């Protein structure tokens, strides 16, 4: 049986999602406006009939498709039945939704339907970006009379596989309430609009990488042969080829207001690069990944500094993580540390090849500077003060480097099915007496940062060319939602 004829096409579904979502947002904003200006309360009966709800998207497969695709990591059904999720910001996610629906519609003959859901849109998510202005005294009344965020309804049970497929079949890893929660947090933490985020993400833990990224990004925008057309900066700066003295415009301190500022090098087709300075520590690393994941990026890479643990390493050498010793502890409750985090072959190869291309060295010379192995991620910046215990554990793990973010980012990529990788640069060798001193640090930074960042950017170029092959089946659970 082919269900196409009795349901919506992907284009029709997207149109209906847009219409239903906009209808609810307008109704909620109008009701809030009336409450603010005249004290008029929202109509309870209208609310019960779905005045402020998210749209719901359902895709049904009857199981009759012969030879369904089995090699791709998404756009697949694990069993016949109906799969449902709620949708927010359909315009923001249009390209993603169209890709996912088209795969299921064309390859499975799936039936697509859109209708109002039972889940109301929390009022804070429609106020931001609107003309509505509130003072502190109004918040209690709004919370009492309008739908608001309820944390008990937000979670990662689907992404973590904590649901029973016979009772509920989710269409995607994140529903609308979870997505809206994270979209609001992303703007708060990074200081940039969520619309500017690009699908290829670099994380760093040092501001100097940001300076280099901005310099390179500005040069790309001015290059007529470059695909990059604009640079969106934390704090609100928007740089194009017409911007006078772009680096001076960016040099203000507005970005310092934000905990994890981001910069977005944008392409016309939305396939650019986002750089996030996550600072130091696994808590920030977990936080930013929790929220970035709802945008369904194509890859995230950690490009930062580490301590080298082997005598044969030199300051400025690179470490390509093949495995992780997770002493960060921030994810233990949802992803126990005894669960292995596999490396992603496509990402590993891209990082290695990019190192060869950027350094201009032949393979044997690259191997002298690029060490592969286990990276320790710790939540204790002063682990050296417990050297006896630390050294024994590191020795058992055969670790080659230590930092405070990489394993957390990789584990979050594993949880949320975002391809991940780590290329670190050795900035000190704490086990061998080579510690960072101010003068040495400055000389190291000046020589290493530009090449290291360029390797990350070149790796993204290689990964972008992979297309859908970048997404790995090894990250799928037994009952994976159809959407990526």
Which residues does each predicted region cover?
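Accessory terminal and edge-of-domain segments that mediate assembly/interaction
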Residues: 1-299, 307-484
């Amino acid at each position: 049986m082919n269900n196409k004829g009795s349901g919506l096409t992907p284009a029709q579904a997207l149109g209906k999602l847009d219409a239903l979502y906009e209808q609810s947002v307008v109704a909620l904003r109008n009701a809030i406006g009336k409450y603010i200006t005249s004290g008029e309360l929202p109509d309870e009966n209208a609310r019960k009939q779905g005045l402020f709800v998210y749209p719901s998207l359902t895709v049904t497969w009857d199981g009759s498709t012969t030879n369904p695709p089995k090699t791709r990591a998404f756009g697949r059904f694990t069993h016949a039945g109906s799969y449902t999720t709620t949708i927010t910001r359909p315009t923001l996610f249009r390209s993603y939704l169209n890709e996912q629906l088209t795969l299921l519609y064309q390859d499975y003959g799936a039936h697509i339907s859109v209708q109002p859901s039972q889940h109301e849109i929390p009022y804070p998510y429609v106020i931001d970006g609107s003309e509505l202005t509130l003072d502190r005294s109004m918040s209690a009344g709004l919370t009492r009379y309008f739908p608001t965020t309820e944390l008990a309804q937000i979670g990662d049970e689907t992404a973590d596989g904590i649901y029973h497929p016979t009772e509920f079949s989710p269409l995607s890893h994140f529903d609308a309430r979870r997505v809206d929660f994270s979209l609001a947090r992303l703007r708060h933490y990074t200081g940039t609009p969520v619309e500017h985020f690009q699908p290829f993400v670099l994380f760093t833990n040092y501001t100097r990488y940001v300076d280099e990224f901005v310099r390179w990004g500005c040069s790309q925008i001015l290059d007529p042969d470059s695909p990059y057309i604009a640079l969106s900066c934390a704090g609100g700066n928007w740089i194009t080829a017409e911007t006078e003295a772009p680096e001076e415009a960016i040099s203000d301190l507005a970005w310092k207001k934000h905990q994890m500022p981001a910069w977005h090098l944008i392409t016309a087709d939305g396939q650019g690069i986002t750089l996030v300075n996550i600072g130091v520590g696994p808590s920030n690393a977990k936080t930013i990944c929790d929220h970035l994941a709802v945008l369904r990026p194509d890859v995230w890479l950690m490009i930062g500094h580490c301590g080298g643990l082997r005598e044969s390493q030199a300051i400025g050498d690179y470490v390509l993580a093949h495995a992780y010793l997770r002493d960060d502890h921030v994810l233990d409750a949802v992803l126990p540390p005894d669960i292995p985090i596999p490396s992603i072959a496509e990402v590993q190869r891209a990082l290695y090849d990019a190192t060869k291309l950027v350094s201009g060295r032949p393979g044997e010379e690259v191997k002298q500077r690029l060490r592969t192995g286990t990276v320790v991620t710790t939540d204790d910046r002063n682990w050296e003060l417990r050297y006896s215990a630390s050294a024994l554990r590191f020795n058992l793990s055969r670790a080659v480097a230590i930092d405070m973010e990489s394993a957390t980012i990789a584990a979050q990529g594993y949880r949320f099915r975002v391809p991940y990788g780590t290329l670190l640069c050795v900035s000190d060798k704490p086990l061998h007496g080579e510690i960072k001193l101010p003068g040495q640090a400055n000389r190291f930074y000046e020589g290493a940062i530009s090449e290291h960042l360029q390797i990350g950017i070149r790796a993204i170029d290689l990964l972008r060319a992979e297309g859908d092959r970048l997404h790995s089946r090894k990250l799928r659970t037994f009952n994976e939602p159809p959407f990526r």
